Amino acid sequence: MSSFNQNKSRRDLNNHSSFLIPHSSLSIYIHVPFCAKKCAYCDFASFPGREADWGRYFDEIMAEIRLWSETTDSGLLSEKYRIATLFIGGGTPTLVDAGYIEKTIDACRRIAPFEPGAEITAEGNPGTLTPGKLAAYRRAGVNRLSLGAQSFDEGLLRSLGRIHTAGQIGEAVTMAREAGFDNINLDLMYALPGQGMDQWTDALDAAIALGVEHLSAYSLIVEPGTPMAARVASGAATVPDDDAVNAMQRQAIARLDAAGYRRYEISNYARPGRECRHNLVYWNRGDYLGLGCAAHSLLGGRRFHNPESLDDYLAGVRRQDEVRLTLQDEMEETLMLSTRTVRGLDLAAWENAFGAPFERGREAAIGRLEKGGLIEIGGGHLRLTTRGMEVQDAVVLELLGENE
């Protein structure tokens, strides 16, 4: 068990929920669960063919916003917070009428005022963007666009079940530029069945050529219950082995670094100053509020989520499985999330938050991991090396196990 003092004051425990983010900053995530077609790999809460529910769903979002604009257990959120980031994800937010998005963003001001220069991101599919929707997003204050490109190979796009073509990715970026967006992310996927290193390199080069500010490169995870999992289980599809996956990741690091994109988290790369501020809140364990079906929240040291069932959400079910995190929960989450970033774990911040040096009781594990080339300590931070990030889960378990 931990040698740290478990009898911290309630005031100190509450401070942990904002580990590196000022208390006054709040992030909001809004889930739009509708999509034109469920992708073969997707196990997110997304629902095709529910157009008739769009209006009801956003009415429920508005009702949830009204609840959060009223007095909560800790008082009015508007008295404590300013909204620093807002992220509209899905599903496919760009599928629904843009008016819903405009009204929802505007309504969030009832929860708390926006900080000057707040980052407001809308996620979307290149096949569902139009100039009219982009203009509406700009009017609503959206200043960052995240597009699910996934691949530039037509065959791979079809096998993934994507509804857009490779050509529409470039068209979407052009449309976004013409609408005034100067902060665009593209999501890419690797370790796909049938994808070789040449195809992955071509995808990286195609994304770089579009000149976007941010790129995310996610390794395919074959989730149980998805069509992709059924294909893999039947032998109809074969995913690359671990060595091939790691080689693809290293290719992304090298190719993107040469093009001016700096890796700042296991799966994310940005031009200097264009890191996704919203995701940094998650990795730094700042306070965030999730609105909509399946949305998760971390607020004032409490974690809770809305139901994943769209029908339950439409019926008014809210805030399931609410728990107040223990000190051990806080430490484990902090370690797991901070080591995803290139910056790593801030050792002074850890000691300030938890009352003892991180190294105490972990000397042997740290020594083994350093000797193995998986972690390094310097500049007041413990960070994972490139090799360490390839096995991040195992590194974190090693560090946690030393403290049991």
Model-inferred region functions:
Residues 1-26, 36, 71, 75-82:
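Flexible, acidic/Gly-rich N-terminal and inter-domain linker regions that tether
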Residues 381-385:
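Minor-groove-contacting beta-hairpin "wing" of winged helix-turn-helix DNA-binding domains
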Residues 387-404:
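Short, amphipathic alpha-helical interaction segments positioned at domain boundaries
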Residues 25-27, 46-72, 81-356, 404:
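C-terminal scaffold of the Radical SAM
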Residues 33-46:
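Local cysteine-cluster metal-coordination motifs and their immediate loop/turn environment
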Residues 356-368:
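Short amphipathic alpha-helical interaction segments
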Residues 30:
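Conserved N-terminal Rossmann-fold NAD(P)-binding element of oxidoreductases
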